């Protein structure tokens, strides 16, 4: 029983941290990274289709993404989707591929992105703490039903607290790494 609660809490906390890392990877830094375009949807035969299903995106160098589109007739549609996205990117076409140069981030934009990253990290911390609260409530229910002793309850709560601390440290580490990446020029 106690192990099930701990394992469930651990799995849910891990998912929260993984979700944070995914969100952070979508936030643009000064470096070109293919995941930057993951959220872009392209109108393809009347349906919104993710760009990664229509093209191969690679980082050509530190400041340029190269997009090789599988269906050449889709170049204009992909270009339009990138232009209308809120990423502030301006692709150029050579008929075969699209090149997307990444403009350097301004100091103001870096600060804004840092605020966004901090808010994402705080959301992840809150999620981890809520999972801890749920696990502790489950333990209290077991204690109330006399399925576990008070000592077992206390021991399990301490272990869940250690889990919480370790996952919050992972969140803080991810935040520090992303802030450092954002502030690099």
UniProtKB/Swiss-Prot annotation:
Subcellular location(s) of the protein: Cytoplasm
UniProt main location, coarse: cytoplasm
Highest taxon listed in the record's lineage: Bacteria
GO cellular component, one term: cytosol
Gene Ontology annotations of biological process type: cytoplasmic translational termination
UniProt keyword list: Cytoplasm, Protein biosynthesis
SUPFAM superfamilies associated with the record: Ribosome recycling factor, RRF (SSF55194)
Entry's Gene Ontology molecular function annotations: ribosomal large subunit binding
Protein family according to the UniProt entry: Belongs to the RRF family.
Its job: Responsible for the release of ribosomes from messenger RNA at the termination of protein biosynthesis. May increase the efficiency of translation by recycling ribosomes from one round of translation to another.
HAMAP family associated with the record: RRF
Protein's name in the database: Ribosome-recycling factor
């Amino acid at each position: 029983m106690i192990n099930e609660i701990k394992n469930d809490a651990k799995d849910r906390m891990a998912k929260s941290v993984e979700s944070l890392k995914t969100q952070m990877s979508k936030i643009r830094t000064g470096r070109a990274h293919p995941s930057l375009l993951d959220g872009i949807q392209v109108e393809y035969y009347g349906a919104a289709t993710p760009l990664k299903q229509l093209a191969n995106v690679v980082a050509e160098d530190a400041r340029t993404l190269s997009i090789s589109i599988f269906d050449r007739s889709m170049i204009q549609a992909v270009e339009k989707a990138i232009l209308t996205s809120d990423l502030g990117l301006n692709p150029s076409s050579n008929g075969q591929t699209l090149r997307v140069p990444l403009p350097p981030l301004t100091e103001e934009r870096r600060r804004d992105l840092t605020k966004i990253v901090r808010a994402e990290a705080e959301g992840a911390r809150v999620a981890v703490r809520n999972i801890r609260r749920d696990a502790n409530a489950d333990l209290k229910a077991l204690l109330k039903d006399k399925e576990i002793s008070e000592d077992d309850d206390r021991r399990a709560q301490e272990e869940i607290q250690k889990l919480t601390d370790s996952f919050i440290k992972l969140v803080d580490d991810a935040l520090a790494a992303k802030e450092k990446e954002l502030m690099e020029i």
